[in-house]
Amino acid sequence: DSLNYLNEELPRYGKTVQLVYGGGSIKKNGIYDKVVDILKANGKVIVEDGGVMPNPTVEKLYEGAKLAKEANVDLILAVGGGSCCDYAKAVSISAHCKEDPWEKYYLKFEDVDADTKIIPVGCVLTMVGTGSEMNGGAVITNPKSKLKIGHVFGDRVFPKFAILNPTFTYSLPKYQMAAGFY
């Protein structure tokens, strides 16, 4: 099981892990329990951050960034598809941003300041198609202004590792699986 590679990656990071996931399908298919067991076996403190929706919102970004900063998170682990990965990367650069991250990164398209702490991100993919696990991009939506903006950041924002296992996609509806290929 490729999820066991998590045991090799986790020792490289501190104790506190922000566990990012979507609507709960990983709880139904057993992936959540496996990930939590591995995190606990490696002595990690888990900070739950579930409920990431497709096209994550700026409000959720603010919530996740606050959570990461207050918990002094050492690693953000996204378990899900492209939206979870995008959200995790956006949180990683926003938690210690000295300005409003929506305005700085998405309206002004500024890059991450050299002295801004970026929290490392790891991804466990449960869906195919976006490539978010291997780039520095992050798309965030602002429902109030009706804007959906993507920003590609430098290589400092790339996930540090990605774990892919085709069996994680077996429970996806056919239309969702097909959408990942096109």
Residue map of PLM features:
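N-terminal small/polar loop signature for handling phosphorylated ligands or for N-terminal nucleophile
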Residues: K27-P101
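Conserved active-site and cofactor/substrate-binding residues in soluble primary-metabolism enzymes
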Residues: Y5, I26, G30, K34, ...
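Conserved beta-strand elements of the Class I
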Residues: Q18-L19, L75-L77, G122
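Local beta-strand N-terminus motif with an aromatic residue
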Residues: G14-V17, V73, P159
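Residue-level signal for short, function-critical loop segments
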Residues: G23-G24, M127
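N-terminal, positively charged, Ser/Thr/Ala/Gly-biased leader segments
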Residues: D1-Q18
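A glycine/threonine-rich phosphate-anchoring loop and its flanking beta-alpha core
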Residues: C97-Y182
